């Protein structure tokens, strides 16, 4: 809510000043008598006053000097509090809207308030020749006492206290913003661009008065012209030389579109337009031979000429549909509004329109685009201008980092509140706690909207924004479970459809206590992984995580509906096969203990943490399993492929070099043969070589990278030699060196050259 000190209540309620001093926007010239009088007349001409009138006005004007501390405050306002000068127009139009709101409210109980004119509008006119900008409204206007109480209040009590608190080094920046926010000086933004400001105003209960200031002092006087405005206020800005750009129609139109598009009242801009018109061609009358003038023919010749005309053009054509109830807005209106605020050529995928009440009241329309921006993740975490904040339909900013969390940066829309207190420049919120309340409600509404998307709509959404939701699970603990309900993953249950976590839990086996998942680069890779073999064979469903962010996402959730997540590529996978199955497994562990001990203590001594009999393998001979807190093969691949990873990162090196568990399949023929050889002799070189090769193939199958790729290639070559009965000692033949003979010059070429010389 834009509250002011007592002195500024009427100003913000009634200011919006536009000149009706012109009759049909024309100004009469006064005769020029002397050089001094000419300069004075120029000043008068701009205000629509004659020379005698301006002399009368100045002789009777009440002059007021701003106190020294007020000058300090004005400098603070002009030089410090506003980050960009263009907001002066926003402030003045906002004040004009307040003035129009007030007269409209008064007219509801007293129609006579509109006796002078029923028009309710804001008009903006630029005079480039004289570097003037006029802003006129037909609002409530101000009486002489209003001018003294309001525009003069800045020089009254409270200023000294305000400045002392503002300059107090012990006062926090938030407290300073609080003070400024309570001291409503939006009108004085005019001095950001103007050296001199003239306010002409007419209230129904008083005569027309003129207030004039150069920011150092001000005067108040009765307008000698009488009532030229009928009702309302006119502000004339004498623009600084560097502010001349604000006289350009396109600049003014763009600023209205940016800040004041949704003001309740029509905003008009004095615009020129060029059009082709038919114009009669004057011809000399034709004569006969005896000199008689021929009769004119009925049809006259015409030509097309360019003609420039000036007229008022309405510049705020888009209506604030969020002010209406959702059931009063057509679907096509939502689509057109989306396109107008986003400049997106495509229609939105979905929208939500709501109003919120409580600690802070606001209205909002939020949209989900059909396509994600191409640079969404290049700009992830940066301020994205997708949510526009309005206060009473006046644009405040879209430069917010905290209006929505980063993962919802694709959401587009508007938020409009009457309750937000703003600092003097309206560039920062005065009470950040209110913004947090709004943010919380916006997130809930967005998630509810996404939850309600039907099958086809959700599929389209998921294909574009699935990564955002997964990032949300990682970044937003307070909404983690709500976001988790939106997650979709491929699974072993259906090759053609994704599944929700809720649907997975419904299909879980009776004594299954964990949600199984396997991460990799593709569905083919994960569904053929040795880690899922026995689970799938036993009828357990496994989630297939094939996106780079998936494993991070799942790791951020400790559980879902009281079911923990279990990465099947890590330790901890247990399959309840009953007591007899457990006894059988213990028997296998005893049987293969010589092999597992030998692998751990001899063959793979420096490569593995331990060797165990696997419960998860069916077809594969072995697998390499990460510890519960280590990197899986997929995570290792992701971490090593980071574009900004350091060459030697201690943390990365720690995880990458952690020893893992080597699991063997007791039913595989290679493992059985290896057990026989080790039992017979632990010095068997073939067994040692086979164990090393088993470890390396298990490393690759399990998704890890090999540390010794050259050694692995050598061992594969040895296997190839053995399978082809090629001696391991057979050497590669030495390449023969072939010398090339030097080319001899061709005789034919020499003959040709000699013939050419002889001709010369």
From Swiss-Prot:
ATP binds at residues 95, 137, 150, 187. Residues 741-760 have a biased composition (Acidic residues). SMART domains: HATPase_c. GO terms for cellular component: endoplasmic reticulum; endoplasmic reticulum lumen; perinuclear region of cytoplasm. Residues 727-760 are annotated as: Disordered. The record marks 426 as: Important for ATP hydrolysis. GO terms for molecular function: ATP binding; ATP hydrolysis activity; ATP-dependent protein folding chaperone; unfolded protein binding. SUPFAM superfamilies: ATPase domain of HSP90 chaperone/DNA topoisomerase II/histidine kinase, HSP90 C-terminal domain, Ribosomal protein S5 domain 2-like. InterPro entries: HATPase_C_sf, Heat_shock_protein_90_CS, HSP90_C, Hsp90_fam, Hsp90_N, Ribosomal_Su5_D2-typ_SF. Disruption phenotype: Adults show increased sensitivity to cisplatin, sodium arsenite and zinc. RNAi-mediated knockdown results in induction of the unfolded protein response. Glycans are attached at residues 95, 423. Gene3D superfamilies: 3.30.230.80, 3.40.50.11260, Heat shock protein 90, C-terminal domain, Histidine kinase-like ATPase, C-terminal domain. GO terms for biological process: ERAD pathway; protein folding. Residues 1-23 form the signal peptide. A motif (Prevents secretion from ER) lies at residues 757-760. Keywords: ATP-binding, Chaperone, Endoplasmic reticulum, Glycoprotein, Nucleotide-binding, Signal. It is found in: Endoplasmic reticulum lumen. Its main location: endoplasmic reticulum. Molecular chaperone that functions in the processing and transport of secreted proteins. Belongs to the heat shock protein 90 family. This is Endoplasmin homolog. It comes from Caenorhabditis elegans. The lineage of its organism: Eukaryota, Metazoa, Ecdysozoa, Nematoda, Chromadorea.
């Amino acid at each position: 809510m834009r509250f002011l000190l007592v002195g500024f209540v009427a100003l913000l309620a009634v200011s919006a000043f536009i000149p009706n001093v012109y009759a049909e926007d024309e100004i009469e010239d006064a005769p020029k008598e002397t050089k001094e009088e000419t300069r004075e007349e120029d000043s008068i001409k701009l205000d629509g006053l004659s020379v005698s009138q301006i002399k009368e006005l100045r002789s009777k004007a009440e002059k007021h000097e701003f106190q020294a501390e007020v000058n300090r405050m004005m400098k603070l306002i002009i030089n410090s509090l506003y980050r960009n000068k263009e907001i002066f127009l926003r402030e003045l139009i906002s004040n004009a809207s307040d003035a129009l709101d007030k007269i409209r409210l008064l007219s509801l109980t007293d129609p006579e308030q509109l006796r002078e004119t029923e028009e309710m509008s804001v008009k903006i006119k630029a005079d480039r020749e004289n570097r003037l900008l006029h802003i006129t409204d037909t609002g409530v206007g101000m009486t002489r006492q209003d001018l003294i109480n309001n525009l003069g209040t800045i020089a009254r009590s409270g200023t000294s206290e305000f400045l002392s608190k503002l300059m107090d080094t012990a006062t926090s920046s938030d407290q300073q913003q609080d003070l400024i926010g309570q001291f409503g000086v939006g009108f004085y933004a005019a001095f950001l661009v103007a050296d001199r400001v003239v306010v002409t105003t007419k209230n129904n209960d008083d005569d027309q008065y003129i207030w004039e200031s150069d920011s150092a002092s001000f005067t108040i006087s009765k307008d000698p012209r009488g009532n030229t405005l009928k009702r309302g206020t006119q502000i004339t800005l004498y623009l600084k030389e560097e502010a001349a750009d604000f006289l350009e129609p396109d600049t003014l139109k763009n600023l209205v579109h940016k800040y004041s598009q949704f003001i309740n009242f029509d905003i008009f801009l004095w615009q020129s337009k060029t059009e082709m018109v038919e114009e009669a061609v004057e011809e000399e009358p034709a004569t006969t031979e005896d000199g008689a003038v021929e009769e004119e023919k009925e049809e006259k010749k015409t030509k097309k000429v360019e003609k420039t005309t000036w007229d008022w053009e309405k510049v705020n054509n888009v209506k604030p549909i969020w002010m209406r109830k959702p059931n009063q807005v057509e679907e096509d209106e939502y689509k057109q509004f989306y396109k107008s605020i986003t400049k997106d050529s495509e229609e939105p995928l979905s929208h939500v329109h709501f109003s919120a009440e409580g600690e802070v009241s606001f209205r909002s329309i939020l949209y989900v685009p059909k396509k994600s921006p191409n640079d969404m993740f290049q700009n992830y975490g940066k301020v994205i201008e997708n949510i526009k904040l309005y206060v009473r339909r006046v644009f405040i900013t879209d430069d917010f980092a905290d209006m929505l969390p980063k993962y919802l940066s694709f959401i587009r829309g508007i938020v409009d509140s009457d309750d937000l207190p703003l600092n003097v420049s309206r560039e920062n919120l005065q009470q950040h706690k209110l913004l947090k309340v709004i943010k919380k409600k916006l997130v809930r509404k967005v998630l509810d909207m996404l939850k309600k998307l039907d099958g086809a709509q959700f599929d389209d959404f998921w294909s574009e924004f699935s990564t955002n939701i997964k990032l949300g699970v990682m970044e937003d603990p307070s909404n983690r479970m709500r976001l988790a309900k939106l997650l979709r993953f491929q699974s072993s249950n259906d090759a053609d459809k994704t599944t929700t976590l809720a649907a997975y839990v419904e299909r879980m086996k009776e004594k299954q206590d964990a949600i199984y998942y396997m991460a990799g680069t593709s569905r083919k890779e994960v569904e053929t992984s040795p880690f899922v073999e026995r689970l799938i064979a036993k009828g357990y469903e496994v989630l297939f995580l094939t996106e780079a962010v998936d494993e991070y996402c799942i790791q951020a959730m400790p559980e879902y509906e009281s079911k923990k997540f279990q990465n099947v590529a890590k330790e901890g996978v247990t399959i309840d096969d009953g007591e007899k199955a457990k006894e059988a497994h213990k028997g296998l562990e005893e049987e293969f203990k010589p092999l597992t001990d030998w692998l751990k203590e001899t063959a793979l001594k420096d490569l593995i943490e331990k060797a165990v009999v696997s419960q998860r393998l069916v077809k594969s001979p072995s697998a390499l399993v990460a510890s519960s807190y280590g990197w899986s093969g997929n995570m290792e691949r992701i971490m090593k492929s980071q574009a900004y990873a350091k060459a030697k990162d201690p943390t990365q090196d720690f995880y990458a070099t952690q020893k893992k568990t080597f699991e063997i399949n007791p039913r595989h023929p290679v493992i059985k043969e290896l057990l026989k050889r080790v039992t017979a002799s632990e010095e068997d070189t073939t067994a040692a070589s086979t164990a090393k090769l088993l470890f390396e193939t298990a490393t690759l199958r399990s998704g890890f990278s090999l540390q010794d790729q050259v050694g692995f290639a050598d061992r594969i070559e040895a296997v190839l030699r053995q399978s082809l009965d090629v001696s391991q000692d057979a050497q590669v033949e030495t390449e023969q060196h072939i010398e090339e003979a030097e080319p001899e010059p061709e005789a034919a070429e020499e003959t040709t050259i000699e013939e050419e010389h002889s001709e010369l």
